[in-house]
Amino acid sequence: NDCEITIDTIEAHYWNYKIDPKKLDKSWGDSIYTDFSDFNECSLKMCVEIFNQDKADKLTRSLSDCDCIRFSDGFWYKFTKKNVTKENAIMKITEVCGFSTDSIIAFGDDYADIGMLELCGTGVAMGNAIDEVKERADIVIGSNDEDGIAGFIENEIL
């Protein structure tokens, strides 16, 4: 095993790398260590750390029914079913509920958020967002550590 992998299912978060379970982010829910040799769960997303760009490109090509987004911090790549995006989910919700995306405020900080920020009426980038997100947002607020969303809601909505 020469790469770190995480897979999220509806029930749990699976991972194959050596880390003290007490140090895992609790927001991941139930984290289960596995070597993935007999993994047979329906996954929502798979993240893989790949340090070699050629190998990352090869994996992306072999998973042609998936979209791939590289995370901004490091060499992690996220694979999800093709066209399963935040913006597509928002469009479905607005269709079912009967309101416009113009009435939605979206918050984001990384590549996977850009489409959502551009789609919604107000796109808000976190202060800790990557530059590409800040450039596409309507507003840039404080970072996650500065409670940027709470401040925005208190000052702009309430």
Where are these regions (language model features)?
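Conserved acidic, metal-coordinating active-site core of Asp-based
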Residues: 2-107, 111-114
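Mg2+-dependent phosphoryl-transfer enzymes with acidic/Ser/Thr/Gly-rich catalytic loops
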Residues: 78-158
